[in-house]
Amino acid sequence: MPFDTDTDIEFTKGTLRHSEYHKILSKHFKVIVSHIFTGQDIFQYEPKEEYDCIVSNPPFRGKSKIVSRVLEFNKPFMLLQPFAIFNDRNPIGLISDQGKQVQILKFNQRAKFIKPSGLIEQKVTFQSGYISTGILENDFIVENLVMPTPKDIREYNKKIERE
């Protein structure tokens, strides 16, 4: 799994937080981690170790460049993206132009994100999910998210602010 770290680097407070990708996937798979902040930029880096697929939360900007680069690896992939990606023919077109089937993992509600400050974003104004090739059992899946309550988010954010 290139393009993630085993710890998320949180710069504003200088703390390290464990990556959710790494924590979950490493329970079942050997995970290769990489990240731009550790000198492994997706546009110049490919792991030397053998790997089977790419699971990543890439930047939401430069979607076409990211999809194009991931396609160069010729591996199944799963990328977290805002669904505004479907407003632009290019990123999705790049996948279908290579004869690959676009797969979608959508959530029943908007996901919450942790901001660089470590706080949970309370109001997310866009829908996001995963675009994928060759990973999902079905081409379109809707997954139910279990979300923290507003009270849980407030308590978590207060705890982070005190740290």
What do the PLM-derived regions correspond to, one by one?
Residues 1-163:
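Class I S-adenosyl-L-methionine-dependent methyltransferase catalytic core
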